[in-house]
């Protein structure tokens, strides 16, 4: 009550922010006449003037009024579009490390040009982040004329581009690309083997479009670069045959409930649990199939990988549905993004789940992958010096943006008042009744010429509605992950009178639905349109536009509520843009996932009390409130999951930053010999300590063990026992110094053979390769630790603290292993004089020719077995083109002495 009273007196924080910014908008507006007087050249010259002022030490914020006025004037000249005052407000919000909530149709793309231009003046680069490649390309090409008019360069960062093209895109003042591609480039840069391979600059300013989709919906999805692990596709196929024998039961066994099934599914946490009966049956079936021996337990340590296969297969069958979670196209399982309904080509589920789904669908099973590098979007975007974002729906997630990303949310007012009618939800008992009611609503709306957009939450549901519309004889377009190539074209014409469009979730986001359809799309379809044709198209469009407005504008139908209110608001936001008329309504049934899992008992009880008849709907504020509460519950739960994920990932993130920082330093220096000498001392000290404990009696020394270790791990054959026999006065410290001196001497002799430059290059290569290999193993170990750490809670220990403690000790152990592996590899490398390598190469060639002739003869004799044996023999002797060169340079054979071939 007190807070409400204070807000009334002083205004909310949002109001105060906007009041402050409106003063700057007035200054920008006052500059407009002055800007209009400037010639094109003078206007372009402003960019160089601003940069010069920044170099002299002026603060970027001081340039806002003039810079924004310049962009507005340039936009008028290039596009014939003038930034509204609310767009200037949005631009200021985005410059202040905030999230701007701007309704659909308010011109977010044009708004973004203001902060993008301002921050590009620093010369450090601006990354505009979009949700898909189409939008990145569209926005870059649309805004390129404006930025180039003002003397700035524009780059597009797309998947599959060669490194030089990517480097050029990142070197541009403003770069457009997708969140995935920026993240993957960051990971790839941190796996590079030379500074020239890196493409990104220092991360300066990110301007994220559809920020809620990227920073919240995809926050739980880590970006992973992986390499192939061992092939186990046969096992997935064998386990897959067993799963159909199992029966699902509704809930888990407990003291009060004993089911008849073999497994239960927890839809909330998306987990599958075997019952006692299920475990017994699985073990019997595994024995029967010859996968497991009689009397063995599935939970024994020896069968841990088998348990992994069973769990993956169970999840694939019970939790993942074709045309909802994935589609099968050209013999490949392609994931469908649950938030956007788009297919995610090239993305794969981890933990063997993707292989299990491939086995279930009977397509070719691809190898499992091993993580080489990974990062979550939460941690990637926090690497930028300055982060901002815009979306039509952020206010419901303002707390999360603030607590995780330290970004405030500012709701920017609309240019014209919103007049859309949001009708109350209608709840039916069954799915069939609900679909029937939707069809009737569509018939009514289209009869009076009103366009309708039907939003569904999966491909399966969109096809179900489509089939019913076809049966009813209603012409319509379907927009889902299966056909998203023509997405923008369908969305652009969804405002046509009486048009019916079915869209999965937020497919087509970023393209405005214009009432009456898009006249620009019609003009673009003509080869060489004349001025008369364009005028006629515009006139026809105006008639259609007015007709649609008179019919009530675009009508939105939601076929069920999403887990998040924000996604529902996004669907509603497609209607009522720029003060247009419009309406929306959600149709629900008690069989919908959200109602079934979170709101069923209360609402179905209410419906029973009201004595509902088939086909009847309940429409009451109580029901709408109960559903909103259910959504809040899910949102809160998902927020907790994301927050917890971040807390755990923060531990890995600190380690990742340390490793990548060291790796980049290593890449940028050409001579690492000082580092090598330093770690050699540490490694030899630790090795000797293990056999000659410091300040111990000679009787406690294990000299044979030390000699063997030095020989095996460092290729050092030292007569230590002989030294001690001949020199009784040789004490511990002197002995340590002598062993280290001998190792340095042997190493220096190798360096003399190959030359200092070659040795420096080789040292750097070994350090980078060893670091990458150990980091990869460390990531896998961290993943295993993370999966089981919650069990520490049963021992009254805080899992998070335990994870921090253990992961730190694992990290320290990894760094020690790094030192040891590097020195061991460098010590064991065999070097030869160039003449020796040439001689060996000559011998190898002669031997290869001789064997090839023999092989030819054996082929003529059709003795394939002998040929195979010879081929194997040849393979043993030959140095592979990608193998390390025998000279010990550290280069690949094909880039060193292999060039002689």
Curated annotation (Swiss-Prot):
May bind 1 zinc ion per subunit. CDD domains: DEXDc_SecA, SF2_C_secA. Keywords: ATP-binding, Cell inner membrane, Cell membrane, Cytoplasm, Membrane, Metal-binding, Nucleotide-binding, Protein transport, Translocase, Translocation, Transport, Zinc. It is a peripheral membrane protein. One of its GO terms (molecular function) is protein-exporting ATPase activity. It is found in: Cell inner membrane; Cytoplasm. Induction: Repressed under conditions of excess protein secretion capacity and derepressed when protein secretion becomes limiting. This is regulated by SecM. Its cofactor is Zn(2+). It is an enzyme of class 7 (translocase). ATP binds at residues 87, 105-109, 512. Its EC number is 7.4.2.8. Residues 859-901 are annotated as: Disordered. Monomer and homodimer. Part of the essential Sec protein translocation apparatus which comprises SecA, SecYEG and auxiliary proteins SecDF-YajC and YidC. Belongs to the SecA family. Part of the Sec protein translocase complex. Interacts with the SecYEG preprotein conducting channel. Has a central role in coupling the hydrolysis of ATP to the transfer of proteins into and across the cell membrane, serving both as a receptor for the preprotein-SecB complex and as an ATP-driven molecular motor driving the stepwise translocation of polypeptide chains across the membrane. NCBIfam families: PRK12904.1 (NF009538), secA (TIGR00963). This is Protein translocase subunit SecA.
């Amino acid at each position: 009550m007190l807070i409400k009273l204070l807000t009334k007196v002083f205004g909310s924080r949002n109001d105060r922010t906007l009041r402050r910014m409106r003063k700057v908008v007035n200054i920008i507006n006052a500059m407009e006449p002055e800007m209009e007087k400037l010639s094109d050249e003078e206007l372009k010259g402003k960019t160089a003037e601003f940069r010069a002022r920044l170099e002299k030490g002026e603060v970027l914020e001081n340039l806002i009024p003039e810079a924004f006025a310049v962009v507005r004037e340039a936009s008028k000249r290039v596009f014939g579009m003038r930034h509204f005052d609310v767009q200037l407000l949005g631009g200021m919000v985005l410059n202040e490390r905030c999230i701007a909530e701007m309704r659909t149709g308010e011109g977010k793309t044009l708004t973004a040009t203001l902060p993008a231009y301002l921050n590009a003046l620093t010369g450090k680069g601006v990354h505009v982040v979009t949700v898909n490649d189409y939008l990145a390309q569209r926005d870059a090409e649309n805004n390129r004329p404006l930025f180039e008019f003002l003397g700035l360069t524009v780059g597009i960062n797309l998947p599959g581009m060669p490194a030089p093209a990517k480097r050029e895109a990142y070197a541009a003042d403003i770069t457009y690309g997708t969140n995935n591609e920026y993240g993957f480039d960051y990971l790839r840069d941190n796996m590079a083997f030379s500074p020239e391979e890196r493409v990104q600059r220092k991360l300066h300013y990110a301007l994220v479009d559809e920020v809620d989709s990227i920073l919240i919906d995809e926050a739980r999805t880590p970006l992973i670069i992986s390499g192939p692990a061992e092939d186990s596709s046969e096992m997935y196929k064998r386990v897959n045959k067993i799963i159909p024998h199992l029966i699902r039961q509704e809930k888990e066994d407990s003291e009060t409930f004993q089911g008849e099934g073999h497994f239960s599914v927890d839809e909330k946490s998306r987990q599958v649990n075997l019952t006692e009966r299920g475990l017994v049956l699985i073990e019997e079936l595994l024995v029967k199939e010859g996968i497991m021996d009689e009397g063995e337990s599935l939970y024994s340590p020896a069968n841990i990988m088998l348990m992994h296969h069973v769990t993956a297969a169970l999840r694939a069958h019970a939790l993942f549905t074709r045309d909802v979670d994935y589609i099968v196209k050209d013999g490949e399982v392609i994931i469908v993004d649950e938030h956007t309904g788009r297919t995610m080509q090239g993305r794969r589920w981890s933990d063997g789940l993707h292989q299990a789904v491939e086995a279930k669908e009977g397509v070719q099973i691809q190898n499992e992958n091993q993580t080489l590098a990974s990062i979550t979007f939460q941690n990637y975007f926090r690497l930028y010096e300055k982060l901002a974002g815009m979306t039509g729906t952020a206010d419901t997630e303002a707390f999360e943006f603030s607590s995780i990303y330290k970004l405030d949310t500012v709701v920017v007012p609309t240019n014209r008042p919103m007049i859309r009618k949001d009708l109350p939800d209608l709840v039916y008992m069954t799915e069939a009744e609900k679909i029937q009611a939707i069809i009737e609503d569509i018939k009514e709306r289209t009869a009076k010429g009103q366009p309708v957009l039907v939003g569904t939450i999966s491909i399966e549901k969109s096809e179900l509605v489509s089939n019913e519309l076809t049966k009813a004889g209603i012409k319509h377009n379907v927009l889902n992950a299966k056909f998203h190539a023509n997405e923008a074209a369908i969305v652009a014409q969804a405002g046509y009178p009486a048009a019916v469009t079915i869209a999965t979730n937020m497919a087509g986001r970023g393209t405005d639905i214009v009432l009456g359809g898009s006249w620009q799309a019609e003009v673009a379809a003509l080869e060489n349109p004349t001025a008369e044709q364009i005028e006629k198209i515009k006139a026809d469009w105006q008639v259609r536009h007015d007709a649609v407005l008179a019919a009530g504008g675009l009508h939105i139908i939601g076929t069920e509520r999403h887990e998040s209110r924000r996604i529902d608001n996004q669907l509603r936001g497609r209607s009522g843009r720029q003060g247009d008329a419009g309406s929306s309504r959600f149709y629900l049934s008690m069989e919908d996932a959200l109602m079934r899992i979170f709101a069923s008992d209360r609402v179905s009880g209410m419906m029973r009390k009201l004595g509902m008849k088939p086909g009847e709907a309940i429409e009451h504020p109580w029901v709408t409130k109960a559903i909103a509460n259910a959504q809040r519950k899910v949102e809160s739960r998902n927020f907790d999951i994301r927050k917890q994920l971040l807390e755990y990932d923060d531990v890995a993130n600190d380690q990742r930053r340390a490793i990548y920082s060291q790796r980049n330093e290593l890449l940028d220096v050409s001579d690492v010999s000082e580092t090598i000498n330093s770690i050699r001392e540490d490694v030899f000290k630790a090795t000797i300590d293990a056999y000659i404990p410091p300040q111990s009696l000679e009787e406690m020394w294990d000299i044979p063990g030390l000699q063997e270790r030095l020989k095996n791990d460092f290729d050092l054959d030292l007569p230590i026992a002989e030294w001690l026999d001949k020199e009784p006065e040789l004490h511990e410290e002197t002995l340590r110094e002598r062993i280290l001196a001998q190792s340095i001497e042997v190493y220096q002799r190798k360096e003399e053979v190959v030359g200092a430059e070659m040795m420096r290059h080789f040292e750097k290569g070994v350090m980078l390769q060893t670091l990458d290999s150990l980091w990869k193993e460390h990531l896998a170990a961290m993943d295993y630790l993370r999966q089981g750490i919650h069990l520490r809670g049963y021992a009254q220990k805080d899992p998070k603290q335990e994870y921090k403690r253990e992961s730190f000790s694992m990290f320290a152990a990894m760094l020690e292993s790094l030192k040891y592996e590097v020195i061991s590899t460098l010590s064991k490398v065999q070097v030869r004089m160039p003449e020796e390598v040439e001689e060996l190469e000559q011998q190898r060639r002669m031997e290869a020719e001789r064997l090839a002739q023999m092989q030819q003869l054996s082929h003529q004799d059709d003795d394939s077995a002998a040929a195979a044996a010879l081929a194997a023999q040849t393979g043993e002797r030959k140095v592979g083109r990608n193998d390390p060169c025998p000279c010990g340079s550290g280069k690949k054979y094909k880039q060193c002495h292999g060039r002689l071939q």
